Amino acid sequence: MIYFTMFLLGGILGIALWFYLSGFITRLQQNIYAIYVELFPQNRSPFQPHFASIQQKKCGHILRYFFSIGVGFIFLQIAFKDSIFTVWIGLTLIILWTISYLDWHYQLISTTPCLWLLTLGLFGADNNFSLLTLSESIKSAASFFIVFYVIYWLAKFYYGKEAFGRGDYWLAMALGSFIHLETLPHFLLLASVLGICFSLIHRKKKEFLPFAPFMNLSAVIIYFVKYYGY
């Protein structure tokens, strides 16, 4: 019964994820247009999203999300045996995948899922799901944010343009709420190595290499290495 419940919960979350991703750019275009009209009401023009520089991409069939995430929740339940922890870690992985997907396809890290992720990190620390205490989680999140914020401005000053996106330091803050501050150098090194290896293997695939997927993968690896006590 618990496995069916987890499958159904995962499937429902998969459907919610599909709706979020399939309409993300459309909602973004509408928000930008609404802000433009509010700022320049005298220059109001018809809403023409098909002329926008960024367009919504297909994200697969809704049933793929339902079944894949539903089955994923079953495997998480089998692995961890704790239903509440399974839901917590499952939601975390869904948000990580969402951030990675958006950055990969649109070179955009929305602050909204980053704040969701931060909330889950702090919630997990406060309820003993995480490897950190609540105070450690807050300290680590703040430190990750500061370090990446400094890196952002140093890179911008050195290159004369944005080498990192502003979303990177918001994502770093969220990831920092899950892993110890002492692992920050390992986190940076592993994310960079993963990005470099991918770019060397697929050097002609992308002109711009999104960093969020490698940051997320680095955090997941470090978290589970610490979780299993290595």
From Swiss-Prot:
The chain crosses the membrane at residues 1-21, 60-80, 84-104, 114-134, 140-160, 181-201, 208-228. GO terms for cellular component: plasma membrane. Pfam families: Peptidase_A24 (PF01478). GO terms for biological process: signal peptide processing. Its main location: membrane. It catalyses: Typically cleaves a -Gly-|-Phe- bond to release an N-terminal, basic peptide of 5-8 residues from type IV prepilin, and then N-methylates the new N-terminal amino group, the methyl donor being S-adenosyl-L-methionine. Its EC number is 3.4.23.43, 2.1.1.-. PANTHER family: PREPILIN LEADER PEPTIDASE_N-METHYLTRANSFERASE-RELATED, TYPE 4 PREPILIN-LIKE PROTEINS LEADER PEPTIDE-PROCESSING ENZYME. Belongs to the peptidase A24 family. This is Prepilin leader peptidase/N-methyltransferase. It comes from Haemophilus influenzae (strain ATCC 51907 / DSM 11121 / KW20 / Rd). The gene is hofD.
